[in-house]
Amino acid sequence: AECKTTIDSTDQMSFNTKAIEIDKACKTFTVELTHSGSLPKNVMGHNLVISKQADMQPIATDGLSAGIDKNYLKEGDTRVIAHTKVIGAGEKDSLTIDVSKLNAAEKYGFFCSFPGHISMMKGTVTLK
């Protein structure tokens, strides 16, 4: 099983995929986030946050006031399953999930919590 994937983010406020598929055979799963744009992180920064789909917008809303130094995530937010830091052009960061903590019956998703980005930068996370 391929237990990792790389997702690129751009200056056009987009990820290069709308879906992450995780093989149930994986013990852990790693997502590397890259940024192929040219803008710095304070202008067009992106992170990748994984949570239950129902929690995505509330996490992003609560994270607005946290600021860029806290990656636009509320400190100690237990709804966040995993997240990268906010990166800018040419940077990369990764996250690793314990696959055993995911429930096949639950709907998961990924998104960018940078202010205003979730509307365009989100997708599904599926166990298969």
From Swiss-Prot:
Plastocyanin-like domain residues: 1-128
MF terms (GO), sorted A to Z: copper ion binding; electron transfer activity
UniProt cross-references to InterPro entries, sorted A to Z: Azurin (IPR014068), BlueCu_1 (IPR000923), BlueCu_1_BS (IPR028871), Cu-binding_ET (IPR050845), Cupredoxin (IPR008972)
Coiled coil regions in record: none
Entry-linked Pfam families: Copper-bind (PF00127)
One of the record's GO cellular component terms: periplasmic space
Annotated protein name in UniProt: Azurin
Protein's organism: Pseudomonas fluorescens biotype B
